[in-house]
Amino acid sequence: MAKKNGAQSVETIPGRKIVLSAGVGKTNIDELKWLTDTVLASASAWKSTGWAYIADCSQMSPVTPAEGSELVTMTKKFVNAGCKAFAFAEGKSIMLKVQAQKNTQRSETGVLEGHFVTVDEALAWLKNEVNI
């Protein structure tokens, strides 16, 4: 069952070490902090074995620079907590893809990332290419 706060929701993928978040519309820094804490709590048991994160951004509005900075902080926290790969489902939005790539780059974590149109494509990539 998904946990929800404002524009954000978080759930785990049954049988896999994957946390999926989805957003709709405009988010804010408080929701992003909640998102970070909720994802970390959901993945806490997998720190030693590794896990993956999927962000379904396909229905999100672009973020502000301040929100982008919060996403950079989130990325660092996820990697420090054992996240091995980030997968982004961005629909057909070039803007969301560019923002996600820049935020990951700014995190300076070197985490593996993939960009996809759908969550199903992201799940397949994590299974076939990342083995999660």
For each predicted feature, which ranges?
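Amphipathic, Lys/Arg-enriched alpha-helical "gate/interface" segment within cytosolic domains
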Residues: 1-132
